[in-house]
Amino acid sequence: MAKYGSADLTISADVNDMSDYVDTVNDVMIEALLQEGTAFGDSWVEQLSTGIKRGSPVTMEGFFDDTAATGPDVTFNALGTTLAMILTWGSTKTSTFSAIVTNYGRKPMRGELTRFTVTLLPVGAVVEA
């Protein structure tokens, strides 16, 4: 069984490789939506699957870079636009989804390098291959 680390993760946003800029990714989660289905006589809460799934927001962070054509500032500082995201885990496992850029910010700190943060909201299916 192969084990993979951060050096094995590739992050692509549209055609730009963001792997050299991003150093933190929160959970890439897919969830099934549920509805409570507890009846009056039940002593335990029951959950029913609605049959609908969604991807949770993905937050990425790294060092700010304003490289004109491919850096995180030009790629992620486009609020409201949709990006084609591909995360490659190790050799061939991928998570592919379209996501709207909902938040983008720069985080300057005294005595430290400026960082960026971006939140991407998946729209439609998150395809695991």
Regions from the language model: what does each represent?
Residues 1-64, 93-119:
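Solvent-exposed edge beta-strands and adjacent loop segments
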Residues 45-46, 64-66, 83, 128:
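Broad hydrophobic/π-residue packing in well-ordered secondary structure
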Residues 121-128:
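Hydrophobic lipid-interacting interfaces of membrane-associated proteins
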Residues 70, 109-111, 128-129:
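Short acidic, gly/pro-rich beta-turn/loop elements at beta-sheet edges
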Residues 65-103:
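Short, acidic/charged, Gly/Pro-enriched secondary-structure junctions
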